[in-house]
């Protein structure tokens, strides 16, 4: 396998870079940086870390993904998909555990790219992607209920699970702070209607500016102090991040490895999906393996500076494209804009109401929910609906790690079932039409099957799901012929169970004085059977290139 085909798009685009392209990238980068600001703060807080860590992630990961990535226009940073995972890790293992899990996920992503496995991600069934994306959306919405309504739990700890959260919400719903509810609803309305007036100015930024000013006035001049702001819960730091090496131990690595796999898989899916969507708009074609290496590098470096997991962000990538972003330079400028905000304007973030950020995340969860797609998938075959619903409910009730693992297992089982259903095993009893496709030599007459000969045709892969089906087909006939011809011209591959099945069949047939003859074996299957040693048992004289030769061989055996 060829490895390490690493070609960052930045370096190829700079060869013919012009002043006009730079000005276009500059404007796009500034706008994307402004769009990313409220999202980075909201994602950081919702994940259970301080707001500046969300911005640090957007800065470092955004810079690295643009510098090393395989897409011209991809914008990286924290996303809503990781909120649930990050929050769960911090609750159970603390921020040190989050650093370890993110580092391992970064290594896994790099390995996926190095060994050119980016295409494998595309084979994850769509119902699984929609199921866990919609499940994450519901979970994000659930985590924001307390801030939307300003609930007071009286020191009672909010459970981490979905059902536990709703139970405590209902128990304390009489503590609703209606000022918080008004702030959240107003924020949602502003975000929803802003695109009608301006496509370029992000609604989330307008909502934060308008609502923050309004709440500041209410607190300062009307004496309303019941609306919590970021400054009421966090100490805002306005300084450049410094690297810190985490303490690693084997027990933590073992415990967090499944979570790291989830982060890597989710990050790979979201980043490649974002890059694919961008390709559809720009007409470009991204390098998925280079993109995965860049994503992995970002997740390897970002946590050392206190950041959280990052990936390609569809909304910010589309904002980049729509505002004229042409090359990775736009993504680098977006990171620089955020760095300047962190260094010089971060203290202003303390005045942002928590209820306003909750409103921002409600819109994020709505956009993530893909409810129209979810509804459409419910009309698909029952197997797809089963995968969709199981992944969805497991994501909500348990966690994303379990949802992805179980969803993939179920999808594999259903896939094998479909292959079994499409693979046909037929019995040809009397004669074979000479016009019957490929492996018959030129012949004008029908090929007569002699008495004492059975011809079986397998149409499809010969793997462990089909072996039993073949045995059942032979058992139904109940005959004991002298020769069994197995026509394998339409068998694309055979696995170990298929080889074992053929070996068992051959040994059993030899005991019953029945000869097995193979016909029309393709080159790939031929090499597999030869390498396994099966031909030594069968006898090379019983391997025939087509059905004509196989029938002649059968006549020799009978006579």
Regions found by a protein language model. Give the residues of each.
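Generic hydrophobic alpha-helical segments
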Residues: 86, 166, 470-474, 550, ...
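Short acidic-hydrophobic, aromatic-tinged amphipathic segments that line or gate anion-handling sites
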Residues: 537-553
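Transmembrane helical cores of multi-pass ion-transport proteins
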Residues: 1-429, 434, 513, 533
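Residue-level detector of flexible, active-site-proximal loop/helix-junction positions
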Residues: 135, 152, 462, 525, ...
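Short secondary-structure capping/turn micro-motifs that flank functional sites
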Residues: 336, 525-526, 545
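The feature marks cytosolic C-terminal regulatory regions of anion transporters and related permeases
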Residues: 367-537, 555-558
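Active-site-adjacent beta-strand anchor residues
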Residues: 76, 131, 518-519, 544
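Short, contiguous clusters of charged residues that form electrostatic/catalytic patches at enzyme active sites
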Residues: 28, 188, 192, 468, ...
């Amino acid at each position: 396998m060829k490895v390490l085909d690493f070609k960052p798009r930045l370096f190829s685009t700079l060869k013919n870079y012009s002043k006009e392209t730079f000005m276009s990238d500059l404007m796009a980068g500034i706008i994307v940086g402004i769009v990313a600001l409220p999202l980075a703060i909201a994602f950081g807080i919702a994940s259970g870390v301080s707001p500046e860590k969300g911005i640090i992630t957007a800065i470092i990961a955004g810079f690295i993904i643009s510098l090393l990535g395989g897409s011209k226009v991809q914008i990286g940073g924290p996303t809503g998909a990781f909120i649930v995972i990050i929050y769960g890790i911090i609750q159970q293992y603390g921020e040190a555990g989050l650093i370890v899990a993110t580092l391992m996920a970064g290594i896994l992503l790099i390995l996926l790219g190095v060994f050119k496995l980016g295409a494998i991600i595309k084979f994850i069934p769509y119902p699984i992607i929609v199921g866990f994306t919609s499940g994450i959306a519901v979970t994000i919405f659930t985590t924001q209920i307390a801030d939307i309504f300003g609930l007071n739990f009286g020191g009672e700890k909010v459970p981490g699970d979905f059902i536990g959260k709703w139970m405590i919400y209902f128990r304390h719903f009489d503590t609703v702070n209606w000022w918080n509810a008004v702030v959240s609803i107003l924020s949602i309305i502003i975000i929803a209607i802003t695109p009608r007036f301006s496509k370029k100015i992000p609604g989330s930024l307008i909502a934060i500016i308008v609502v923050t000013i309004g709440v500041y006035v209410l607190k300062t001049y009307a004496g309303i102090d019941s609306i919590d702001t970021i400054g009421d819960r966090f100490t805002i730091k306005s300084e450049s991040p410094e690297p810190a090496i985490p303490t690693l131990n084997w027990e933590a690595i073992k415990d967090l490895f499944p979570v790291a796999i989830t982060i890597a898989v989710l990050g790979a899916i979201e980043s490649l999906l974002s890059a694919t969507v961008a390709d559809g708009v720009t007409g470009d074609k991204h390098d998925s393996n280079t993109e995965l290496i860049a994503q992995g590098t970002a997740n390897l470096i970002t946590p050392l500076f206190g950041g959280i997991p990052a990936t390609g962000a569809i909304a910010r990538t589309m904002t980049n494209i729509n505002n004229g972003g042409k090359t990775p330079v736009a993504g680098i400028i977006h990171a620089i804009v955020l760095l300047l905000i962190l260094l010089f304007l971060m203290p202003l973030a303390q005045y942002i109401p928590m209820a306003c950020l909750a409103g921002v995340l409600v819109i994020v969860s709505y956009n993530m929910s893909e409810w129209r797609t979810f509804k459409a998938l419910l009309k698909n075959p029952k197997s797809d609906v089963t995968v969709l619903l199981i992944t969805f409910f497991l994501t909500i009730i348990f966690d994303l790690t379990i949802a992805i693992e179980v969803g993939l297992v179920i999808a594999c089982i259903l896939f094998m079932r479909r292959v079994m259903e499409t693979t046909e095993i037929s019995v040809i009893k009397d004669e074979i039409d000479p016009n019957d496709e490929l492996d018959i030599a030129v012949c004008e007459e029908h090929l007569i099957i002699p008495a004492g000969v059975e011809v079986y045709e397998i149409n499809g892969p010969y793997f462990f799901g089909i072996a039993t089906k073949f045995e059942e087909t032979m058992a139904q006939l109940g005959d004991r012929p002298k020769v069994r011809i197995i026509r394998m011209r339409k068998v694309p591959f055979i696995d170990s169970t298929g080889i074992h099945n053929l070996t068992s069949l051959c040994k059993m047939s030899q005991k019953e004085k029945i000869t097995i003859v193979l016909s029309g074996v393709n080159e790939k299957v031929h090499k597999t059977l030869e390498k396994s040693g099966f031909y030594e048992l069968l006898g090379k004289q019983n391997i025939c290139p087509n059905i004509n030769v196989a029938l002649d061989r059968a006549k020799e055996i009978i006579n």
